[in-house]
Structures are given as structure tokens and as C-alpha cells.
């Protein structure tokens, strides 16, 4: 009798196990969805560099968390170092219609009838550039730091955008338009060493601090 009961319950326990596995899988996906979404955009930019900027003089640094003058932190998606300038790249893996201009504090993403607000990425990158200006003040002039905003191809701009805001790989031509050597090889090495020295080690602590910093900026 016991053996028969176990045989009857075995498929039930097996099904319950799969349901629990699916439940936790969905939960984990939802928790990490914003992180994964951001990473997909960053991977796309890294792929653009590999495919279209094959000159070894271009050096791509990814996902840098740096301290600012207030003791807070700022996270930079990409830094592209080159003799022609330093390109500070903010990626946005957003789809749908995008509304915004250079001066607006908040931009809008519209997908069908749903609208979502997000921080102006130009303002975000301005903060990144100011941190870099201070960090590299004795090595490179501020006007050699260039802001680049990259949305994914699924985004559609519904308002005119500044000339440094792009979809997909369009930003590559902008970078290539800078073709005059402005930074020596020695200075590029110094910049790399300075960044390696100042960048914060990746950890859950720095991630939490960055999230809190973003929340505070949105509220201010």
C-alpha cells in the first residue's frame, strides 16, 4: 500500500518541483532584468568597437565606477580612449518612441499606450565628464572629453536630438570624424594608469551605492 502511495505521489512531487523551479526562475529574471537590460546595451557598444574601430589606437574600457568630489560614486558605461579624444559613452537599451531634448531633466519612453519617464542621459553623462575632468585635470584638457549617447536600434527618436545622440552603430561615424591627433601615446598610458588606480572594485556594495546615488539625483 505504501509503495502504491509513493508511486502515486511521485509524479505530483515531480510536477511541484518543476513549478517551483519555474517560479524561482521567473523571480530571478525579474530581479535581474534591469541589470541584464543594461548589460545588453553595453555589449552592443563593445561589439561596435570590435567590428568598426579596428585601429589598435582605440582602447575601450567598460563599466567603470569612480568616486566623485563629494564621496559619492558615478558609473560610466564605456570610455573610449584614442589619440583623437576621449569618448564618454552612455548606453540606453530602450525601445519604442523616445521624446526629449538637451535641456529637459526628464525624457519619455512610449511603448504603445504606455509612457515611462527616465533621466536625461545627456545630463547623466555630463556628471561623468565632470568627474573625469577633475580626475584627469593634470593630463588632458576638458575639451578633449566628448559625450556620446547610444540608444539601441529598437528606439525611435520622435523629437530632434543633439548631434551626439545616436541609435545603433551610428555613433561610430561621429567618433571617426575626430581624426586629428590631440593626445600623445604617453598621455594615453598615463590616463589608463590613473583610471586603473582610481576605479572602484566591483562589488555589491558599489552597486548599491550607485543605485542610491541615482535615486537621490532623480529626487533632487
Regions found by a protein language model. Name each.
Residues 92-95:
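Short glycine-enriched loops at secondary-structure junctions
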Amino acid at each position: 500500500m505504501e509503495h502504491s502511495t509513493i508511486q502515486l505521489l511521485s509524479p505530483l512531487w515531480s510536477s511541484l518541483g518543476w513549478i517551483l523551479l519555474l517560479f524561482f526562475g521567473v523571480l530571478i529574471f525579474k530581479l535581474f532584468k534591469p541589470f541584464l537590460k543594461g548589460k545588453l546595451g553595453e555589449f552592443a557598444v563593445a561589439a561596435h568597437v570590435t567590428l568598426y574601430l579596428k585601429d589598435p589606437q582605440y582602447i575601450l574600457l567598460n563599466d567603470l565606477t569612480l568616486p566623485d568630489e563629494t564621496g559619492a560614486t558615478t558609473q560610466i558605461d564605456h570610455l573610449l580612449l584614442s589619440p583623437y579624444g576621449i569618448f564618454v559613452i552612455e548606453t540606453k537599451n530602450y525601445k519604442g518612441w523616445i521624446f526629449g531634448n538637451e535641456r529637459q531633466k526628464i525624457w519619455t519612453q512610449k511603448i504603445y499606450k504606455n509612457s515611462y519617464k527616465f533621466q536625461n542621459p545627456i545630463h547623466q553623462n555630463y556628471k561623468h565628464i565632470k568627474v573625469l575632468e577633475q580626475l584627469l585635470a593634470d593630463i588632458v584638457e576638458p575639451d578633449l572629453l566628448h559625450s556620446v549617447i547610444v540608444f539601441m536600434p529598437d528606439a525611435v527618436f520622435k523629437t530632434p536630438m543633439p548631434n551626439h545622440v545616436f541609435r545603433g552603430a551610428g555613433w561610430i561615424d561621429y567618433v571617426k570624424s575626430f581624426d586629428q591627433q590631440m593626445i600623445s601615446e604617453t598621455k594615453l598610458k598615463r590616463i589608463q594608469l590613473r583610471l586603473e588606480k582610481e576605479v572602484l572594485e566591483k562589488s555589491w556594495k558599489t552597486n548599491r551605492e550607485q543605485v542610491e546615488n541615482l535615486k537621490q539625483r532623480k529626487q533632487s
